[in-house]
Regions:
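Secondary-structure transition/capping motifs at alpha-helix termini
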Residues: 23-34, 88-97
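Long, well-structured alpha-helical subdomains associated
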Residues: 62-76, 80-116
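Post-HEXXH active-site segment of zinc metalloproteases
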Residues: 25-74
Length: 116
């Protein structure tokens, strides 16, 4: 299965990992004036429903906060996004439209590729 669907599974995983895994996300931050870069009325903590209380200060960066772990943490986030999104048909419709009858096998191969 890894050999048969390697091209399709790698296309899916790499596209979702790179385009949406790395290409999405919001760094909550305040500027030098203390203004937040998100709508505080609309965006809430997804676990509590309360206002967001932790965020980056002005001039703070991702790598400053996480040090040497920042790149590994970002790769794990991108992989998680890719693995979540392959649960849905839309990526298969976009990247493997002519393989509909093989989508289950390609899906399974995606998981194998991630752990192989």
């Amino acid at each position: 299965m890894l050999e048969k669907y390697s091209k399709e599974s790698l296309t899916l995983i790499v596209a979702l990992h790179e385009l949406l895994g790395h290409g999405t996300g919001k760094l909550f931050q305040v500027n030098d004036k203390g203004e937040k870069n998100w709508d505080t009325e609309a965006v809430k903590n997804p676990f509590t429903g309360e206002e967001i209380t932790t965020f980056y200060g002005a001039q703070e960066t991702w790598s400053q906060k996480f040090g040497k772990l920042h790149s590994g943490y970002e790769e794990c986030r991108a992989d998680s996004v890719a693995l979540h999104l392959i649960q849905f048909e839309r990526p298969f419709e976009i990247f493997c439209p002519d393989q509909r009858e093989n989508w289950d096998d390609i899906y399974y191969t995606c998981w194998l590729e991630m752990i192989y």
